[in-house]
């Protein structure tokens, strides 16, 4: 898992997300506490439970983006789910236990990649030997059995040198590779994904591990052989246990749109996709044991981060038990004009950088001036104020409208430099921004 300090985590998040310092700090502290807990003695470690977080803020201010970036930094099993996709147990739809199953699947995949990477050097050696066996077949005795040579022949060593230098990369060879497992696609109703995956694995194992001769260039064969040999060096049972340990000790679940499962007013009849889901989430967040195809997983030390806009509902509309299990509250602020300006220029891959790169593929050089950036930010903020406030997502709409003409004519503008300043922005957007009806439908 990540050993970054809270300051380093916030610094990394700053490269992609503007503002929202409180949310970044809370998430960074929660992530660091995962590492701190693992440094404790085993007895105390079991007593330290994660402090789950509830992020509250209007749409488009960076809640989901924080989760996306955190997933890359965490180096731990991580899954992001939408609260609206689940229903109460016993009704048609996904049940909340599938969150932990999906998290465990992600952990198995992550641990497998790490194990293969750890065995890569040995796998490369074995793959090299298999290719050399094809190029220079080993000597056989009178009974047709391969003789074990004490020392590699001079010819084999010469070919090994050429292979490592890449001189044989384009030479074609025929080599036996493990045949791809039989592809079986089973469509199952929601909530029965576990049974589907078990049936699929059963059908795939029916064929056994068959070898299939394939004709490939040496550089392509080497890649496939390295993967095959590395997979052989990995113990599946150890891998499953390591994955379950990783989920139990370091797993992070991000639940988005949690405000959409708040109860709205008085309603008769069962509320299976709202309050029912909240009730089902309680044992997961508090700590329970979930059965997965890889084994039993305890959720006591999984960190849960929930987020919601809470424009219609309020955090107090969540059932009290769930509120108590999300003790850390972080409020994200609505974005201002100056935030929009920073969003357009400061992140590593800001929208303006993306548009410049896209147009450069057609030979068109785009220049955004400071006055142009400021005017775009003002236009986006103005439309947000007069219609629905969708935060930074409005910048995509405004910029797409602004760049439409250039994008359409780009192939005819090759070699030209187009400067987008305040006058250019005003000319293309002022009429739309000023007319509230037009901006409501177009921007």
UniProtKB/Swiss-Prot annotation:
GO terms for biological process: protein unfolding; proteolysis involved in protein catabolic process. A double ring-shaped homohexamer of HslV is capped on each side by a ring-shaped HslU homohexamer. The assembly of the HslU/HslV complex is dependent on binding of ATP. Belongs to the ClpX chaperone family. HslU subfamily. It holds the Pfam family AAA. Induction: By heat shock. InterPro entries: AAA+_ATPase, ATP-dep_Clp_protease_ClpX, ATPase_AAA_core, Clp_ATPase_C, HslU, P-loop_NTPase. This is ATP-dependent protease ATPase subunit HslU. Signal peptide: none annotated. It comes from Escherichia coli O1:K1 / APEC.
């Amino acid at each position: 898992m990540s050993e970054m300090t809270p300051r380093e985590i916030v610094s990394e998040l700053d490269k992609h997300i503007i503002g929202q310092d409180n949310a970044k700090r809370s998430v960074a502290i929660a992530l660091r506490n995962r590492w701190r807990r693992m440094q404790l003695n085993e007895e105390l470690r079991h007593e330290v439970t994660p402090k789950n977080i509830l992020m509250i803020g209007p749409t488009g201010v960076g809640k989901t983006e924080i989760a996306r970036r955190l997933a890359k930094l965490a180096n731990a099993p991580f899954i992001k789910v939408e609260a609206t996709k689940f229903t109460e147990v016993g009704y048609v739809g996904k049940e909340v236990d599938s969150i932990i199953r999906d998290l465990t699947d992600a952990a198995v995949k992550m641990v497998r990649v790490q194990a293969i990477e750890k065995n890569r050097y040995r796998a490369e050696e074995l793959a090299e030997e298999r290719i050399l066996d094809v190029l220079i077949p080993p000597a056989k005795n009178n009974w047709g059995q391969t003789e074990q040579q004490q020392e590699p022949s001079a010819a084999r060593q010469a070919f090994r040198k050429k292979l490592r230098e890449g001189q044989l990369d384009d030479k074609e060879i025929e080599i036996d590779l493990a045949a791809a497992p039989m592809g079986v696609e089973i469509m199952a109703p929601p909530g029965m994904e576990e049974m589907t995956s078990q049936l699929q694995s059963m059908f795939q194992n029916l064929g056994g591990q068959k070898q299939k001769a394939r004709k490939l260039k040496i550089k392509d064969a080497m890649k496939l052989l390295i993967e095959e040999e590395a997979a052989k060096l990995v113990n599946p049972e150890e891998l499953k246990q390591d994955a379950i340990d990783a989920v139990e000790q370091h797993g992070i679940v991000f639940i988005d749109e949690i405000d959409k499962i708040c109860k709205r007013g008085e309603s008769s009849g069962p509320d299976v996709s709202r309050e029912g889901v909240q009730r089902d989430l309680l044992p997961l967040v508090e700590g329970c044991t979930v059965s997965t195809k890889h084994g039993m997983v305890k959720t006591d030390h999984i960190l849960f981060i929930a987020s919601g806009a809470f424009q219609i509902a309020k955090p107090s509309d969540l059932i009290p038990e769930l509120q108590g299990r999300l003790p850390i509250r972080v409020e994200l602020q609505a974005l201002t004009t100056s935030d929009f300006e920073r969003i357009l220029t400061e992140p590593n891959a800001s929208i303006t950088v993306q548009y410049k790169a896209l147009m450069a593929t057609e030979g068109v050089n785009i220049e955004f001036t400071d006055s142009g950036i400021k005017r775009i930010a003002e236009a986006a903020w103005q439309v947000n104020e007069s219609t629905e406030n969708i935060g930074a997502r409005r910048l995509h709409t405004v910029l797409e409208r602004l760049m439409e003409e250039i994008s359409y004519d780009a192939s005819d503008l090759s070699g030209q430099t187009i400067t987008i300043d305040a006058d250019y922005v005003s000319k293309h957007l002022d009429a739309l921004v000023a007319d509230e009806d037009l901006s409501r439908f177009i921007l």
